[in-house]
Amino acid sequence: SSAFDKCLQIPLVLASCHHLLGEFKLHGANLRDPRKGYGHQQIHTDVPKCFDDDWWVLNAIVLFDDMTLENGPTRVVPGSHHWQPINVPVVNLGEWEPSEPTDKEKARLPKDLDAPYPGEMLLTAKAGSVVITNSSLWHSGTVKNADIHRRVCHLTYTRRDLPQQLTQIDYLTKPLYDRMNAAHRFLMEIEPEDAAGIKRQKKREHSGWWN
């Protein structure tokens, strides 16, 4: 569908990606609108921490509706992108293998991944806003208590020398390719129409998103 093509060319998002990542490409994309009573997630980071002083994946949360305290706002722990990764989805682990945490890191780890974390914030913003974070930030969805939409598009971007979460060229259709201009094809890494040489995530056995 072409319905979300405009999300690929939000100038401030692309400028932020270039400023924080350098040469970049699309990493992944999904849409989220939990039903009332649902939407809670365990606290997690989307990617492992591969570079202590460097961004390597960026999250852009594009709000199609107001995000309020009642409709399941995203919770974040400010500054946690400098900490150790936590509860990373298997699909994003790649070649990373966790090391034994230090005593300081162990002290940070929550005993309950579902419980509120000290210092966490609930993000609220108006429709049309975009929230940009480091993908190593500790965060999660929360329960939607109101029966109103909270539609968001999650876009992630990564450096061009690193693999995508979803290798876009593997799912490429001719209508999609034909309607993309040269800049969009470069952004999605679908140009040329050849999967040879595309860097890919290491395959891991898993039964679901997190395990």
Language model features: what each stretch is:
Residues 31-36, 67-69, 81-82, 136-139, ...:
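Short, solvent-exposed loop/turn segments at secondary-structure junctions
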Residues 69-140:
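Double-stranded beta-helix
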Residues 30, 45-47, 62-66, 78:
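Short, structured patches in soluble enzyme cores that scaffold and shape functional sites
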Residues 1-52:
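Non-heme Fe(II)-dependent double-stranded beta-helix
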Residues 43-46, 94, 103-117, 147-149, ...:
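Short, surface-exposed loop/helix-turn segments at secondary-structure junctions
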Residues 51-69, 124-127, 132, 156-160:
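Short, conserved beta-strand element in jelly-roll/cupin
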Residues 46-57, 118-119, 125, 148-149:
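A short beta-loop-beta micro-motif enriched in histidine and acidic residues
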Residues 130, 137-211:
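Non-heme Fe(II)/2-oxoglutarate
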